[in-house]
Design a protein with these regions (language model features):
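Membrane-interface helix-loop-helix junctions at transmembrane boundaries of multi-pass membrane enzymes
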Residues: 22-27, 172-185, 377-390
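Hydrophobic, membrane-inserted alpha-helices
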Residues: 9-14, 165-170, 189-197, 345-349, ...
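Small-residue-enriched transmembrane helix-hairpin modules in multi-pass membrane proteins
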Residues: 143-152, 246-367
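Hydrophobic alpha-helical segments
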Residues: 340-443
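N-terminal "leader" segments that precede or initiate the main folded domain
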Residues: 1-99, 187-194, 210-254, 389, ...
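Hydrophobic alpha-helical transmembrane segments
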Residues: 2-11, 68-78, 112-124, 149-166, 281-292, 353, ...
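Membrane-embedded catalytic interface detector for glycan/lipid assembly enzymes
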Residues: 57-61, 87-231, 244-257, 403, ...
Length: 443
């Protein structure tokens, strides 16, 4: 089954990506984190539903139709998000705006670059003098900042500012793309961020997302929509390539299938089944009639960020940590949580674990609307060099991505975010009043 359905899933992903690119490539740049996560989840659930080994349940999975149900649940987001973002970009008329970083109205590009370098150097120094570099000490970055961080405010800079710094560096590199010497210094600074991430033992998350954030900033200033060229999808070449992939999977899994010493099978199961095993587990409970709706628990989940000033993602009463106990065998979940690790999941998994498919389906519509607004406003703020507004939008967007990826409501509903939401509402009111005479919309 995997040798048939995985190539088919690749084909769907390629066609979907091409259609978005031909509509507006900026959509891919602004929503890259969400698209990659969604595509990985899509391929993962198909791989699992075709019979992957799930270590949390200590067994091979079997077909339950979970892949079909996931596709239906994510469909509103997959279809609406690109459409709404494209509409928002055109409505604001910001896709053709071209302004330069470091204008006379704001902070100069040189000073901004120096501040970015100082922040990166500060974080690198903190890791190097700590005496416990995570890469060589086998500890995660969270534990490092809790127990081994030396310099003050290092964690605040790392958690709140470093991701945005990667966007700013990308924007600078994009604007200076015709000056190779100047462009190199921004790429060097970005390279320092990646070195920091490696030292912090962030070998996957923390590498590709920072690279995509840099690309986002670069693309904002590098791309000119008026010169956009649409590409024709090479159907024959894609089908031939996917046929080869299917044959390779078939040979590999018929020759080496279910061998305890087969590294190829282990690698594929870890790559493809790493992401969405929790959804398969929760869906199986529904499928077997073992699920009991917990509406009160769902309300508490939504309010979890307001019940405590600093609620932990590892709290077994909420979010994906709660799901871990529902889908894992024995004490596996407890052992993972005690080590500081979460299973992979998403907002669909968490909502499905409380109130079922209907609310999960509706949530995809809501999330598509909110994320498209955030992406469009972030793009406009970066392009007009309103760094404060851009930072606020980017921070909120990152948290929505974490919610999209992990599913804990406390990530987007808490006291800190309540202040940010009120701030954005005030910005919107001010923008409406200032643009009323000119006939423009709000920010």
């Amino acid at each position: 089954m995997q040798s048939i359905f995985i190539p088919l899933s690749f084909f769907v992903v390629i066609v979907y990506t091409f259609r978005i690119y031909n509509r507006n490539p900026l959509i891919l740049a602004l929503g890259s984190l969400f698209f990659i996560e969604m595509i990985w989840q899509f391929i993962s659930i198909i791989w699992i539903d075709c019979g992957a080994y799930i270590s949390e349940q200590l067994r091979y999975s079997y077909y339950t139709g979970a892949s079909i149900r996931y596709t239906l649940l994510i469909m509103p987001f997959a279809c609406l998000f690109p459409y709404l973002l494209d509409r928002n970009l055109k409505r604001k008329k910001i896709t053709t705006v071209r302004l330069k970083l470091g204008s006379d109205k704001g902070i100069s590009k040189q000073i901004l670059y120096i501040l970015c370098l100082l922040a990166i150097g500060y974080l690198l120094t903190n890791v190097l003098i700590s005496g416990a570099i995570p890469l060589f000490s086998h500890i995660n970055y969270s534990r490092f900042y809790d127990q081994y961080s030396v310099l003050p405010f290092a964690r605040i800079i790392y958690d709140y500012f470093l991701p945005f710094i990667s966007v700013i560096l990308g924007g600078m590199a994009g604007e200076a793309r015709k000056n190779n010497k100047e462009t190199k210094i921004y790429f060097i600074a970005m390279g320092m961020i990646l070195v920091l991430q490696l030292l912090l033992n962030c070998k996957f998350y923390g590498l590709y997302d920072y690279i995509l954030q840099f690309v986002l900033g670069f693309f904002v200033f590098q791309y000119d929509l008026s010169k956009h060229t649409k590409f024709k999808l090479p159907i024959k070449a894609i089908l031939i390539g996917l046929l080869g992939v299917g044959i390779l999977l078939y040979i590999s899994y018929t020759k080496y299938s279910y061998s305890e010493i087969n590294p190829f099978q282990y690698l594929l199961d870890r790559v493809f089944a790493l992401q969405y095993h929790t959804f398969w587990g929760i869906d199986k409970l529904h499928h077997e009639g073992l699920f009991t709706s917990d509406t009160i628990g769902f309300v508490n989940e939504i309010l979890s960020g307001f019940l405590s000033l600093d609620i932990s993602r590892l709290n077994p009463d909420y979010g994906i940590a709660r799901v871990m106990y529902m889908v894992s065998a024995g004490t596996y979940a407890r052992d993972m949580l005690s080590s500081g690790y979460l299973f992979a999941g998403s907002y669909l998994t968490v909502i499905l674990s409380y109130v079922g498919y209907l609310f999960a389906f509706i949530s995809s519509f809501i999330l598509a609307f909110i994320v498209s607004k955030l992406c469009a406003n972030l793009y406009g703020s970066i392009l007009t060099k309103n760094y404060f507004a851009a930072f606020v939008y980017f921070y909120i967007l990152k948290r929505y991505y974490e919610f999209f990826r992990v599913g804990n409501f406390a990530m987007i509903l808490n006291w800190k975010f309540l202040v940010l939401y009120l701030f954005l509402f005030l910005m919107y009111i001010v923008s409406l009043r200032s643009n009323r005479n000119s006939g423009k919309g709000g920010f």
